[in-house]
Amino acid sequence: MMKPVLTTIAVAALAACGDREVVVGEDYQRVLDPLAREIDKLDVLFVIDTSGSMQPEQQALVDAAGTRLFSQLEQDLGGLPDLHVAVITTDVVIARPGVPGCLSEDLRDNGRFRVGLDTIGCPGIDGRYLIDEDDGVGGRRRNYQGTLAEAFTCAASLEIGSGCGFEHPLEAARRAFDGRHPDQLDFLRSEAMLLVVFVTDEDDCSASSGELFADPTAGLDSPLGPRTSFRCFEFGVVCDGDQPRVFGEKSGCRPRDDSPYLTPIESYRDFLAGLKPDPSLVMVTGMYAPPTPVVVGQEPTGVVRPDFPALQPTCVAPATGVEATPAIRLDALVQQFPSRFVFESMCESEMSQRLYRIARSTAGVMSRSPCLLGNVDITTTTERCRAFDVAPDGSQRVLSGCRTANEQGCFHVGPSQTCGYTPHGVAARYRGTLAAGHRLVVDCLAPVGR
């Protein structure tokens, strides 16, 4: 079972933590790891699902991005960062002709930056992605006409309904930067934060070959099973008991690392982390359904056949009514970026609220905010965390947790009004002054159930 990047402590390691009540052997996860310095450059890649069910969510995205993403970044950072913004779809060439809506030839998409509708484009945008950056003489260098919100609205207005129902968001993100599109490589700047935003109502189905989509007339007696999106779950995820076609609720579901058909999650984690010289400059966010509960039931009547197994929707998105199924692989990937991931459930808030929190979280990382990101909640306190004073050369010393309100030379974890944009509103601070160039790095035990 793959877990987020974390560490397991032994008894000896507890001595430096004093007498705090910590469960020996439990896993800590990094929740605060500030950049060495504040940065003002941001590369943003949107990976958008263009399957038919996503039309309301795509419209909500383009309607809200101007005020809830770009304007919020400008407000939080005291000015708009130097921006590169690109859009791709979840469609890639799957090397298997005849799959409705899916690419069998390298004609478009396949990791290519998209600028609006394929037949029209965006005449006001000069290039394959948006540029809005300081020109060095007090102004801005832009490659678009009108406002940034208007330009993004056009760029992100794609052919919804034309997309493949076997979504490949992770493979699409890789193909955007793996060298097959040389004109896109200048999008990435070594000194800029990279923010990857996945927007989809289904889990990742990034296949390692076209064999997953073979045998289009297969039934329940076929090893592959019916050619529906359930194949992505059956061969991309493993749950306790490993009987994917049996109806009912599943437990312990995680990416199937030994899948003969889907690419392992670690491959995408390593690729994305390697896009910047400093992996801490890579941030991954997602708008998708929570990975639980996982329930297998009947295909909706009239879609294929009611006796065929199907992954049941986890929830329905507010305002848009989009049904979303559990994104187990995608969630596992996002959580491989400790203190650099933001999960925004498609089920619990509207698009404008999701973009607001993503913008504020991104600005927080860029400005070295003390707000914790990751698997923490309002019950996370100093007693459930450990902290380090990390020097510029990477050496570190263990810090003790504060036991009283006035104690100095220690770290404290607790609620903070400045972190209200996070799901938990928790921050970590050092009481005292760290040496110049030193950083406060914090690990915490995950909440029960995560």
Regions found by a protein language model. Give the residues of each.
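Divalent cation-coordinating acidic motifs and surrounding scaffolds
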Residues: G18-R450
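C-terminal motif of bacterial Sec signal peptides marking the signal peptidase cleavage site
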Residues: L14-A16
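Sec-dependent signal peptide recognition
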Residues: M2-T8, R329
